[in-house]
Each structure stands twice: as structure tokens, then as C-alpha cells.
Design a protein with these regions (language model features):
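Low-complexity, Ser/Thr/Pro/Gly-enriched N-terminal "stalk/linker" regions
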Residues: 1-41, 52-101, 148-150, 178, ...
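Well-ordered alpha-helical scaffold segments within catalytic/enzyme domains
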Residues: 42-58, 70, 112-127, 167-180
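A surface/extracellular/periplasmic glyco- and lipid-processing/surface-interacting theme
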Residues: 128-190
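Structured domain cores in non-transmembrane regions
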Residues: 96, 100-104, 112, 116
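Aromatic- and histidine-enriched alpha-helix N-cap/loop-to-helix transition segments
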Residues: 34-48, 105-113, 159-167
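Active-site-adjacent structural elements in enzyme catalytic domains
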Residues: 62-73, 102, 116-124, 129-142
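Conserved aromatic-histidine-acidic binding/catalytic patches
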Residues: 31-38, 59, 102-106, 122, ...
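Active-site groove signature of glycoside hydrolases
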Residues: 108-120, 150-158
């Protein structure tokens, strides 16, 4: 594919890098991967970039939508088959293009970034489905990536350590504004 050729030129990935991807999706390949690996943080960063770089002259909404669809296809436990059955969950944190999901859980920072990107996409492009998806993801994140006291877990399947870079105070305040859930004010001050 054309995308595979681009990755081969600039990242060392094979021409078949996107061969098994669900239709209408895009992904970010981890530059350090020995396999053609995508991590959920890369999708979240890509979504943020597409929405923040869009303006009247350059509109990246279609690229944003492809990244968001990839997230939905690889929602926790869906392994590329969830494109039409996503119910709000975070994305499996590692996806190998050849074998599917290989990360056993989600990464909190990716959920925070993707939810912020969806809120900003709603503000940028006015499509209310972005806001509805953001609310679903925020609620899922609260139930799976957060402690009841507002502290952040590293992801949905582990709670082994606190990573200060996962405390996304600005996002938490935005989540409170969007959901009207006081929990996020607690998270912002925890």
C-alpha cells in the first residue's frame, strides 16, 4: 500500500505495514518496535495532533476519524473486530498488525489524550458524536483507570505504581466540565 511504502521509507516498517488493518482506519507505528507495533498512546497523540493542526486552510478531520476508528476497532477485548461494537472502552495498549492485540489492558494516559482530542474535535468541527464518544470514554476511564479516591491507575489491568506523568490535571478539569461529575475535580487535586 502507499502508506506501507511511506513507512518503509521513513520508519523501516515493511510495505505490508497496514495490510491487515480494518478498512477506513489509520495508525501510528511505534518507531522503536521490532514488530510493526501500535500503542494506544500513539493513537491518542495522533488524534490530538490532527485536531490541533486543523484550521481553515488545513483540515485533518478525515485523518482524525481514521485514527479514532482504529481506536474503536481495538477497544479493550475487541482485537480489531470491534469497529461497530465499541461501547466506550479504552484501546488495548499494544497492537501488532499481524497478530492483533498483544497488550493485556489499556494505558490511562492514552485514554486521557483520546478523550481530550474528542472534546476538542467537537469544538473544532461541531460534530456532536465526538462529544458523545468522549463522554463514553471518560465514564469508562473513571471506572477502569481511576481509583475511587481520584488517583490514577497506570491502566485497566494493573495498579503496580503511580506514574506522575499520568496525572493529567487539565484533562480532569475538562472532563468535569463536560460530564458535570465532581469526581474529576477530586482527581485534579489528588
Amino acid at each position: 500500500t502507499e502508506a506501507g511504502q511511506f513507512y518503509a521509507m521513513y520508519g523501516g516498517a515493511s510495505e505490508n505495514a497496514n495490510q491487515r488493518m480494518p478498512s477506513g482506519t489509520a495508525r501510528v507505528i511505534s518507531p522503536n518496535a521490532k514488530v510493526e507495533l501500535t500503542v494506544s498512546e500513539g493513537i491518542g497523540y495522533g488524534m490530538l495532533l490532527m485536531v490541533y493542526m486543523s484550521d481553515a486552510q488545513n483540515d485533518y478531520q478525515s485523518e482524525f476519524d481514521k485514527l479514532w476508528k482504529y481506536w474503536k476497532c481495538y477497544g479493550k477485548g475487541l482485537n480489531g473486530n470491534g469497529c461497530n461494537s465499541w461501547s466506550g472502552q479504552g484501546m488495548d495498549w499494544q497492537v501488532d498488525n499481524y497478530t492483533g492485540s498483544i497488550g493485556g489492558g489499556t494505558a490511562s494516559d492514552a485514554e486521557f489524550d483520546a478523550a481530550v482530542a474528542l472534546i476538542m474535535a467537537y469544538k473544532q468541527w461541531g460534530n456532536s458524536s465526538y462529544l458523545e464518544d468522549a463522554k463514553k470514554l471518560i465514564n469508562w476511564t473513571k471506572s477502569n483507570d481511576m481509583q475511587s479516591d481520584g488517583s490514577v491507575r497506570p491502566g485497566s489491568n494493573w495498579n503496580d505504581a503511580f506514574n506522575p506523568s499520568y496525572s493529567h490535571v487539565g484533562a480532569f478539569k475538562l472532563f468535569q466540565e463536560v460530564t458535570n461529575d465532581a469526581f474529576w475535580n477530586t482527581a485534579a487535586t489528588t
